[in-house]
Amino acid sequence: MSDHRQSLESDHHDRAVAALREQYAAIPAGAPVRLAKATSNLFRFRAEQSGGLDVARFDRVLSVDTATRTAQVQGMTTYENLVDATLPHGLMPLVVPQLKTITLGGAVAGLGIESSSYRNGLPHESVRELEVMTGDGEVVVVGPEDDLFRGFPNSYGTLGYTLRLKIDLEPVKPYVRLRHVPFADAAECARVISEVCAEGSYRGEPVDFVDGTVFSGREQYLTLANWADSAPFTSDYTGNAIYYRSIQRRSVDYLTVRDYLWRWDTDWFWCSRAFGVQHPVVRRLVPKRYLRSDVYRKVVAWDRRHRLSARLSKAVQEPVIQDVEIPVDRLAEFLEFFHREIGISPVWLCPVRLKDRAGWPLYPMDPDVLYVNVGFWSTVSLRPDEELGSRNRLIEDKVTELGGHKSLYSDSYYDEEEFWDNYNGPTYRDLKKRYDQAGRLPDLYAKCVLRR
């Protein structure tokens, strides 16, 4: 990016910050503050609200520095746009969450993960600097030694909003080679995850990316991928072919780097089947531009609002849309419980180890433990005697029992005491007093559990 272009982008950012501060100042004292956003990847649905701070101008990549392998990015920039800006330079973010419209600010204030997380940790661990508008309306710049920087991940916009980030990048190669390795036994699968993540290789070949797909208790696959300078062929899963189905059919595959990064977006992992677009006839009729996770999410939001599927269903359907981190040595136990009590399939696996040993107080993972993110996104039919939320509570209890953690992007059912035990209530309250003394932003428990 030229010096002139960087100067223009910097000026744009400064003007956007000034305009946002004016918006904040215009909100009556004591009135709650929130964002007005066009997109979301959260699954905590609540009643529509008008107004809010307009952050539409915070969606740009401000600079890409190839010498330092860093990028300056605004908080509402999507990973899709960031990747499009960095790949021409042979670079990418250290962790690129699976869905195109996840924003940098959202991934840092919440949690993100992908197949590079076993070596690069979580997205916020590659952030060097954050510019934040706090709940008090102040704009501050913080780094790794600051309490707000450490406490920002898993705060979900209750301490402030990300305006700008400086993040690390890493080099890429043109192609990614994938090996889909089957396992009939979850314990053996977990053992290999531990081995691969410790050694960075499998059977003598390097492994740069690790994730997995569980189709049943007797059928799970690890996808072990590595960079490649060339490819004998490349597959395309952005049209008629469906990526997750290829896992069972191919032992080796090749993708371009961009298609690898977005391999899960076209079918929202496998959740597009709920909309009928995996049927071959329907698939051919749907324009490719609509085969995207953000399109499906809008359909789900509309359905939640109007309760169409709930009215059509004979049984009460409980949404079970969660990502949980389980210590790898308890993974098989969790999967056995999950198959028995919940019964959703497929299930996604993604190993993660913290990169920064200093840790992140609001999501207190042990830096000495390799965790496996287990993702599952569907609905479960409840028996007449079951209350809505009962299956999610079963999962929450099991995750706590096994020493795991649960992301807060979707429905949560913890009581308040348990919630603050899990998410470091004392530290959160100290941060809240310092950066949102008047309580203009919602409390984390109120936002994530009470949906306020």
Q: Predicted segment positions?
A:
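Noncatalytic alpha-helical scaffold of FAD-dependent oxidoreductases
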Residues: 1-452
